[in-house]
Amino acid sequence: WTFMDGLHQNIKSYTHSGSKPCKMAATGEAPIGISFAYRGAKEKAAGAPLELIFPSEGLGWEMEAAGILKGTKQLAAAQTLMDWAASEKANQLYNEGYAIVAMPGIAKPVAHFPAEPEKLLIKNDFDWAAQNRDSILTEWQKRYEGKAEAK
């Protein structure tokens, strides 16, 4: 929490959108926006006057997932959707919004984004994050909620 306490002193407001801080910096509404790296690269490629800084500690990331609910009444349709979601075509479409996709060899380089981004990812422990989610959110709200934008 030490890092966040220091950062908090320099935060005007916390948004509920991961890309909004970058968009605000791109339009001049804010001098700095802490955001998804991919959004920053896209804004800069579109001409925004941004200087992108990637943390030397590594890039944060999250995992997208899809699945079929046990007992679904439309199993064949659900399986068709999941087959498509794991297809080469779907991975090509994912690359329009993500620098890294699941299928090797599909992702194209993104302008203004680090080369070989997979090597820059921090280690994520999803089990730990899930087990500690409630306590982390409670502590975050106690410390920082006062600067969060309204939902």
Predicted regions and their residues:
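A bilobed periplasmic-binding-protein/Venus flytrap-type ligand-binding module shared by bacterial periplasmic
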Residues: E62-Q74, L93-Y94
